[in-house]
């Protein structure tokens, strides 16, 4: 029988989704599963987007332009200007989700064997996209004890060699909820400038910042305009994960030309998704305020509740809608599996994402989990209670 590719063998399983069969089996038994494992917002999609889809009046659902509709890109220029990010429509390429923007960034900017420095824990699919592009992820570890703040510049420079081509950040961060400070962003800028690296900056959670700290975009950093490739998506801010619309943004004309070749090869981003995403920009500002206020309350509910459970510790996330928590267990992945396959409390259980899958360094994050606060508060309260009961009953607790 023919063998699968090395790429297929090396492709990692998603720590977010790989326990899904166990969750399905639990539900088949009639057990209610509280999903804290995946960043699927439960808040309503903007009415403007839903109405735009319902009111589509076209006789043909044709290909859209490979770079996305100009009308949508023009509206995005106005959206980004609110964050002091000054763009033209030509700087913006619409992609099939933020994931495609990451992949096309790698394909356009990196050669096989080139290395990308990424702070860990990191969004697990970055590794998958790097493998797809033949690139190599080199991680610099941040720790829960330090609140996931960046290490000093010397730690970065220890990793930089002739193969280093880029730094990749997610700000605010998935999975930790950490928000990079101005000092940290300037540190990254200086490294990018000194070693002439690309800076891939995933900024899909910019709407969700819960402190007085400012949002510092990679596009705000002076002197590296042609090094920056910004990754964006409508999935989280508008609860539109299913329409698969993202954006790749750069002032670097050569990068845009290269990216467009990959865009043309995949033909076009989703037509209907663009219609919905463009309409979302017309939603009254009240929508965004209500969503933000809801996440503020959920964040407090989850973090306060976690830190009241004996042996559990979570730092306070400053952005996004995730946190990484340390549990009093010997192996968080085994605990997550046990919760779905062997435990329930009054017919309920919880699904968490083992955090080890967000690290590449072996052994790190073994007793950590990522939780997403994408459930209404009463469900979060109940999920925390069930989690407490699970930890009390777990045979591998420490």
Report each predicted region and the residues it spans.
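Conserved N-terminal alpha-helix of the aminotransferase class I/II PLP-enzyme fold
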Residues: 63-96
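PLP-dependent class I/II
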Residues: 2-4, 8-14, 19-32, 38-56, ...
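Basic nucleic-acid-binding alpha-helical/helix-turn surface characteristic of O6-alkylguanine DNA
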Residues: 59
């Amino acid at each position: 029988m023919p063998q699968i590719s090395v790429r297929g063998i090396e492709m990692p399983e998603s720590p977010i989704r790989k326990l899904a069969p166990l969750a399905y089996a639990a539900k088949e038994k009639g057990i209610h599963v509280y999903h804290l494992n995946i960043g699927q917002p439960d808040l309503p999609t903007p009415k403007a987007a839903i109405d735009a889809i319902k009111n589509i009046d076209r006789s043909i659902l044709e290909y859209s332009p490979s770079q996305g509709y100009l009308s949508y890109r023009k509206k995005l220029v106005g959206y980004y200007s609110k964050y002091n990010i000054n763009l033209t429509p030509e700087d913006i390429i619409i992609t099939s989700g933020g994931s495609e923007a990451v992949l096309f960034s790698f394909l356009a900017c990196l050669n096989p064997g080139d290395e990308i420095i990424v702070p860990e824990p990191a969004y697990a699919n970055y590794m998958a996209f790097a493998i797809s592009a033949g690139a190599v992820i080199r991680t610099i570890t941040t720790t829960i004890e330090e609140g996931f703040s960046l290490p000093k510049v010397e730690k970065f420079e220890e990793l930089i060699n002739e193969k280093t081509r880029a730094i990749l950040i997610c700000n605010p961060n998935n999975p930790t909820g950490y928000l990079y400070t101005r000092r940290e962003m300037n540190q990254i800028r200086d490294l990018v400038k000194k070693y002439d690296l690309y800076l891939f900056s995933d900024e899909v959670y910019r709407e969700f910042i819960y402190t007085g700290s400012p949002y510092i975009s990679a596009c705000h950093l002076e002197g590296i305009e042609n090094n920056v490739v910004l990754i964006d998506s409508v999935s989280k801010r508008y609860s539109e994960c299913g329409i698969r619309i993202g954006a790749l943004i750069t002032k670097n004309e050569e990068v845009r030309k290269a990216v467009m070749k990959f865009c043309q090869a995949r033909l076009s981003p989703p037509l209907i998704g663009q219609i919905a995403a463009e309409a979302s920009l017309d939603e009254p500002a009240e929508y965004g305020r209500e969503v933000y206020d809801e996440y503020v309350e959920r964040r407090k509910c989850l973090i306060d509740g976690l830190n009241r459970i004996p042996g559990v510790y979570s730092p306070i996330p400053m952005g996004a809608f995730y946190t990484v928590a340390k549990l009093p267990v010997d192996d968080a992945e085994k605990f997550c599996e046990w919760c779905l396959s062997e435990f329930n409390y009054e017919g309920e259980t919880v699904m968490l994402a083992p955090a080890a899958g967000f690290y590449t360094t072996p052994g790190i994050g073994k007793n950590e989990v990522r939780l997403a606060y994408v459930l209404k508060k009463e469900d979060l309260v109940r999920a925390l209670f069930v989690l407490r009961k699970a930890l009390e009953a777990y045979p591998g607790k420490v």
